[in-house]
């Protein structure tokens, strides 16, 4: 690993990158070993999250492999398997089987899925935290950079579609064209650092080095702190981003 957190010249990464291009996880990982599963089980008390009186409403999105539809896990459905399903990259891990259905990462159909927050929560504010840059100044030319940008666009596409729907409903309400009161205004906020995230190498997504993870955490806290200082007073009052300009 280089000082800039790239894994481009890492022998281990090169081997993994090659193997995942020519073999499926059912071939190179027949035992379906995923170290993340043990960490999640040790770190999260799922029984607390399942309680009806739990103050936190958690919604996990996954993609149904057979139907291509988004699946939202919530309430008593929350489990370690649901977490694994929501983070299952199909080139790295077996599809996660839950109740006879196979699931991949939710990012393909909902990244994140906003509709559960609109339908099932009372808050008028939705704060999205971006880990994939929406905008890049340069057109990618290297093969790896092109594939990375394709991945970013694909994972951002579902969010773009949902934001278009939010914008449409918001305009209807503003124009007094909603008469039955069945729709409500949603305020959108965004915490993002495209400059920092865009400067990272695509290979950094595979970097589990502790110092690198700490640097991401620290940058995230800095970005969130700056956002709160600037936009906290807008919560419950107005959107802090121009949805049409940013997402449409």
Regions found by a protein language model. Give the residues of each.
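Patatin-like phospholipase
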Residues: 1-248
